[in-house]
Structure formats: structure tokens, C-alpha cells
UniProtKB/Swiss-Prot annotation:
SMART domains: RL11
Protein name: Large ribosomal subunit protein uL11
NCBIfam families tied to this protein: L11_bact
Keywords: Methylation, Ribonucleoprotein, Ribosomal protein, RNA-binding, rRNA-binding
Modifications made to the protein after synthesis: One or more lysine residues are methylated.
Family: Belongs to the universal ribosomal protein uL11 family.
GO biological process: translation
GO CC annotations, alphabetized: cytosolic large ribosomal subunit
Amino acid sequence: MAKKIQAYIKLQVKAGQANPSPPVGPALGQHGVNIMEFCKAFNARTQGMEPGLPTPVIITVYSDRSFTFETKSTPASVLLKKAAGISSGSSRPNTQKVGTVNRAQLEEIAKAKQADLTAADLEAAVRTIAGSARSMGLNVEGV
């Protein structure tokens, strides 16, 4: 018989830098999960990623206090800010532009995000990422 699911926990943890401090510790502790076991497993799985990039993770906690987790790709907004060399998006995106991204950068981000996007092909994924860039106040060249 399958294990009974107790909870789903959604967190954003920096790749390779999970530790028992907030937000990881309290979120897992209230469900009785072994926090250090999760931290070690998460850090091992994200070892190949660039350290420090926020990585969304969905943790499934079962009634016997065991868990499984699934990592997603880094949010598009973080990748766009990194590509444009800015620290935050515009507070007025339609009037005040804070940076520029080109087609090659958008394609690179779309390839990294394609598994998590619902886009049918790379071109649709590029358009989706370009829309995210515009909503952050970035100029988009070549799309």
C-alpha cells in the first residue's frame, strides 16, 4: 500500500547552501522531518548548480515522517536579473527601464527553464521569458 501523504512544503533554498536555520528548519520541523537528512540530500542534489542561486523545492512529507523532494529550475526573474546585471526589477516597468537583455540571453534562459515551462517549443519559451523580462522593466532586443 502507498504511503499516506501528510503535507507538501514549498520552499526556495539557495543551491548547495541548505542548513537548519530558517526558513528550512521551522518548515520541516513542524512536520517532524529529519532536517539534517533533508539538508544533506538537497545539497548533494544541487551540487552541480551554481552555488547561491535560489532553487524552488517541493517536499512531500509522509505520515511516517519520511519525505521525498523535487527540485525545480531557478526562477526566471533571478536568471533575468543576472543576465541584465541588475539587482532588482523596475518599480515602474512600463515607464522606467532598468536594463536590457538580448535574444541570445533569452534563449539561454529559456533552455534552462524549458522543463518547467508549458511552452510547446523553444520559440514559445523565449516569448514567455521575454514577457517576464518586460514586466520587470527590462528592454528586450531581437524578439
